[in-house]
């Protein structure tokens, strides 16, 4: 409904122009229009995403190393291990630097020798690890209850949930779709520019969405049976991955092995997403300023590391920094990206591909339907032109409402926006790491 049509549009813009977002608008926009001015929004979005994603990806690598070395064996207080890691700016910086080095190092090798080859290996390894972890979890005694909890729907909680209304659940799902598919910032259009014209884009986008769902389902098959098998609450929330699961693996036979494999799976997924977005950033610089790939790496690598430091310091040195209605440094960066840049960017792609003042519907369909495969459905034109923009606006407005309510409460209570309450580091959307598997699956590096 939302993600696939926009993904098709990003692919079409990239493939028709054979350029990154830096030049794709300029190549396709009607003469006299100014769509190319919006390219900077995409670059800012990619940077914002990486400013906190590299840090979270660093956590996953750190946990893989700790699990492989047996750090969690016999550890009663996993929270102390996690707190010690994010509370140490030097350790956190080290893991972030490792992520940046791996990501830019792979991209520096080029598309075929670097990004394409490494990502193919990582994705193959990812699915092998996932299958092994799924089999292990499904064979655990007591795991059946976890399967029932995970796979049997409870519609009463959907419509009568004290924690969230049905509208809030739908809004969250739409926002999740934008984030998972990395649409709205041009990171998918760059991979569209690498596609040949022998395949129609609708089928490619649908396959990516289905793969996204498959990875999400498999992740649930790994986690929930294990939680029920060892009496762990499945609604432990953000702390589930980094605080609860190490205890679960500790109780398993060969738990050190399974724990290391699980965090290797999460780290591989997250790293493949980092590589994909790094490639979009580098191609933007190469197209916009006409510089070589090596020079683009030399400029963007230190810049991204520097801009990632506020997120690193937000968990320790700047832990007292709070924005009411939003949260800490990482939450602020996520808010600007997920609640603003992603929906606005998605709306711009839709308007560009459906309006006469933009590229236009006819040219979009012509490009999307080149080659063999599934055509973009003709009946979807009205939905894409009017329904999708309406949904995007709903996501944008609903994303701001809770924050505005808090700000208005401060205003009428005579408070100041500098005042703020405590925000636990575990408010971090740790599902980013799991989403990395889905995002990486959404990067068609080579047709």
Features from the language model and the residues they span:
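Membrane-water interface regions at transmembrane-helix termini and the short interhelical loops
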Residues: 34-50, 83, 87, 98-122, ...
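C-terminal membrane-solvent junction of multi-pass transporters and transport-like membrane proteins
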Residues: 37-46, 289-301, 334-392
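Loop-to-transmembrane helix boundary motifs in multi-pass membrane proteins
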Residues: 89-94, 211-217, 256-259, 268-271, ...
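Helix-loop-helix connectors at the membrane interface of multi-pass transporters/channels
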Residues: 57-87, 194-198, 203, 207-215, ...
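Inter-helical loop and helix-membrane interface segments of multi-pass membrane transporters/permeases
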Residues: 21-41, 54-112, 142-171, 238-242, ...
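A generic transmembrane alpha-helix motif of multi-pass inner-membrane proteins
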Residues: 93, 327-351, 373-418, 422-433
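Membrane-embedded translocation segments of transport machinery
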Residues: 116, 120-271, 275, 295-296, ...
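Juxtamembrane transmembrane-helix boundary signature
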Residues: 1-30, 226, 230-233, 351-360
